[in-house]
């Protein structure tokens, strides 16, 4: 490359695709992953093709970091990373930032009950910062940290877990604002028997209540302060305006302020300002914007929080038993002395469960991680338990390991004409991307020695998919239907089976992951259980599970999908027994928030659509209204003709024009005094607005024109609460009719031609539009798990 090409920005998607595919191909070729140079070239071409056609996308750190050194020679100063040399197996320190990139999005890090030493609390914040800077996320289980008031070995009492979590939250928030690639992402998890579990459950709930208090309180302070000043200014007698006995409005304003809990020092300050001649007091007011000052003031806003729930705890809830909490030191001492630990506190399990429910209902945290079930499906349980997860909870494995993700866009493997899912193409893509993720482990660097070593030892991958909500809609199948559950199960089964089979194939050449021998029996047990799920085996056939999964129901699954799923898991078990596996884990289903946009997905991960119409904020300003691209395809699949489909889509998203609109249209606007040029300008910007009232405003029409031609008073043109449509004489009924016609109802309910029996196909996670009533009930989703 020329100097300009080497150090200029990437201006074409092809440059990025070649940077990524070229890096994977280079490392794979150099380390024996391809049988011939022709195979390597074919691999490069296929990977570029899949990226360009939005069939698959790797996780964000791959886009940020992979290939910057290989393609452009970019190095950068070392950032304290480590890697295992793939040729020697030796742990080495990275000499620059990009020769070994950081392609992993997901990390799980351990933290010990130590303040300043390596592996301890303050060291964790440094390791987290190293990850955030390069666009990755991390999670940790903080259950080893002593609780509030727990005795310290050197005397005194521990300040407790929450004090340290607040420090980590602040650190993440700072990087959040100044990071080089994306916002910080972290997961904080805690075992249910920790002494501080109650405070942890209520943490985010309490902090969000503080935000509400700041928002409401600041507005009240502003209002009451200025009501006091107004009472002072309105009193006619200058000498007695501060005398509450003679200025009764002032006395009332002060009394009302005190009843509203306005602090006395604020009231005193207002009176002093009044004495100095001030007529208005500016008090900083806050809003509920998540990027606003109120949220930045409180803690707990820079992480997802989860509690680790065991079967024992759930049984205690069902039995209405007490639940014991333990000092961390007591657990350690009891283990050393081979005795049962003594609890520091006992709480009714139902009280904790109610706390979790209330907090999650209020602020969506904490989430639940089912510790027993997770560990029963753990491929490497002899090497230790799974304690936590990455920020989005799709990756669960041993502490101090990492996972790099990629997701396949399922819609790209579905043929709308034949209404068949291409399992052969899907399987081929899974194989190629399993190789890409394995190569990414080979070339990667990591934020600590422990993570570098353990990622080399276990080589965990995270291949998944996205857009299943759109796929099901295109198939004409409701998301909460039994058929949807079976199809989702079969596609997930094929994903896991083909990926683990590819891992076994790589193991036959490259050897299994270094810790495989120690975990062989357990990993093969897990693989056999996956195979049983593909065959929908009876519960008693599963090995080592207390809660068995729902298998693929052959009554609802297309035979060709079921057969493909069963065939690949037969191969996994057979090949795994022969060769072992190159990777301790191969698949996850990630939320795909960012890469879902890259692949132009209508739905993310395994989720249904949350709304048929979305409003996308554009980087250059403005907003774009987008309908789920699968709606017209689904209507065709359900038998509606093109005219009917167009009318249904217009009902949902609107016509986007004044022409033909009831109530408010080109003709009526011209009669009200607007010119053709102004109407044309307004119509060109309809896609950036959500209602006629927000579109037809003095700022959009022109303030001078409003004053001179439409007779709007000057004091109104800058008033955000002024309604120009009302001023022009339009009624609420006319405005509502125009909104429905131009901007759409945002729901398919009530659309012309649509059959009631077809509505379920278009159901979303939320009610759609102001008139929508239907949504996917949360219990139906749970039933189909």
Segment roles from a protein language model:
Residues 1-783:
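Extended catalytic cores of very large enzyme megasubunits
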């Amino acid at each position: 490359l020329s100097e300009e090409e080497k150090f200029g920005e990437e201006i074409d998607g092809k440059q990025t695709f070649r940077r990524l595919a070229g890096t994977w191909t280079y490392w794979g070729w150099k380390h024996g992953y391809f049988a011939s140079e022709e195979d390597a070239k074919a691999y490069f071409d296929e990977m570029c093709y899949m990226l360009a056609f939005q069939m698959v996308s790797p996780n964000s750190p791959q886009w940020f970091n992979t290939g910057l050194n290989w393609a452009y020679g970019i190095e950068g100063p070392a950032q304290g990373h480590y890697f295992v040399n793939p040729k020697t197996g030796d742990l080495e320190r990275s000499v620059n930032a990009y020769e070994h990139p950081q392609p992993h999005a997901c990390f799980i890090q351990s933290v010990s009950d130590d303040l300043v030493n390596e592996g301890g609390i303050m060291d964790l914040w440094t390791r987290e910062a190293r990850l955030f800077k390069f666009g990755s996320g991390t999670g940790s289980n903080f259950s080893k940290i002593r609780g509030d008031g727990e005795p310290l070995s050197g005397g005194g009492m521990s300040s407790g877990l929450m004090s340290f979590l607040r420090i980590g939250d602040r650190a993440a928030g700072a990087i959040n604002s100044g990071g080089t690639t994306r916002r910080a992402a972290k997961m904080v998890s805690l075992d249910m028997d920790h002494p501080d579990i109650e405070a942890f459950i209520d943490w985010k709930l309490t902090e969000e209540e503080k935000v509400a208090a700041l928002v409401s309180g600041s507005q009240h302070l502003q209002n009451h302060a200025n009501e006091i000043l107004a009472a002072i200014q309105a009193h006619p007698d200058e000498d007695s305006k501060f005398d509450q006995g003679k200025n009764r409005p002032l006395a009332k304003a002060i009394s009302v302020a005190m009843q509203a809990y306005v602090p006395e020092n604020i009231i005193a300050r207002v009176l002093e300002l009044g004495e100095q001649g001030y007529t208005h007091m500016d008090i900083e007011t806050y809003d509920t914007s998540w990027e606003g000052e109120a949220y930045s003031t409180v803690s707990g806003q820079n992480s997802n929080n989860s509690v680790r729930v065991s079967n024992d705890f759930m049984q205690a809830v069902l039995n209405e038993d007490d639940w014991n909490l333990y000092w961390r030191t007591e657990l350690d001492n009891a283990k050393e002395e081979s005795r049962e630990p003594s609890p520091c506190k006992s709480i009714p399990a139902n009280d904790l469960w109610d706390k979790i429910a209330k907090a999650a209902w209020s602020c969506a945290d904490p989430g639940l991680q089912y510790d027993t079930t997770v560990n029963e499906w753990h491929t490497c349980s002899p090497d230790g338990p799974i304690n936590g997860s990455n920020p989005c909870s799709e990756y669960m494995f041993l502490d101090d390991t990492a996972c790099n993700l990629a997701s396949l866009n399922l819609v790209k493997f579905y043929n709308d004409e034949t209404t068949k899912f291409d399992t052969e193409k899907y399987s081929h893509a899974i194989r190629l991307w399993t190789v890409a993720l394995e190569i990414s482990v080979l070339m990667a660097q990591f934020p600590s020695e422990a993570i570098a070593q353990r990622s080399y030892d276990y080589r965990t991958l995270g291949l998944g998919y996205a857009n299943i909500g759109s796929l099901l809609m295109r198939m004409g199948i409701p998301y909460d239907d039994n058929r949807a559950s079976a199809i989702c199960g079969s596609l997930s089964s094929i994903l896991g089976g083909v990926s683990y089979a590819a891992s076994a194939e790589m193991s036959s050449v490259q050897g299994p992951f270094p810790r495989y021998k120690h975990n062989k029996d357990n990993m093969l047990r897990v693989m056999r259980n996956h195979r049983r799920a593909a065959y929908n085996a009876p519960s008693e056939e599963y090995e080592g599970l207390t809660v068995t999964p729902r298998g693929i129901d052959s009554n609802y699954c297309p035979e060709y999908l079921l057969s493909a799923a069963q065939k690949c898991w037969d191969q996994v078990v057979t090949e795994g027994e022969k060769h072992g596996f190159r990777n301790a884990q191969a698949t996850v289903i990630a939320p795909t928030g960012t890469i879902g946009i890259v692949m132009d997905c209508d739905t993310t991960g395994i989720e249904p659509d949350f709304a048929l119409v979305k409003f996308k904020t554009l980087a250059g300003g403005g907003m774009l209204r987008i309908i789920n691209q699968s709606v017209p395809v689904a209507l065709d699949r359900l038998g509606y003709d093109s005219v009917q489909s167009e009318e249904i889509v217009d009902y949902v998203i609107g016509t986007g024009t004044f022409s033909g609109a009831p109530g408010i249209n080109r003709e009526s606007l011209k009669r009200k005094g607007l010119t053709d040029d102004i109407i044309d300008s307004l119509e060109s910007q309809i896609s950036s607005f959500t209602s006629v009232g927000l579109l037809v405003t003095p700022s959009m029409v022109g303030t001078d024109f409003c004053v001179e031609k439409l007779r709007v008073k000057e004091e109104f043109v800058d008033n955000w609460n002024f309604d120009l449509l009302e001023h022009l004489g339009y009624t609420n009924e006319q405005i509502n009719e125009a909104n429905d016609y131009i901007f759409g109802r945002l729901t398919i309910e009530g659309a012309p031609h649509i059959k009631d029996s077809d509505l379920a196909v278009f159901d979303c996670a939320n009610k759609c539009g102001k008139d929508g009533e239907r949504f996917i009930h949360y219990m139906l989703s749970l039933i189909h798990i």
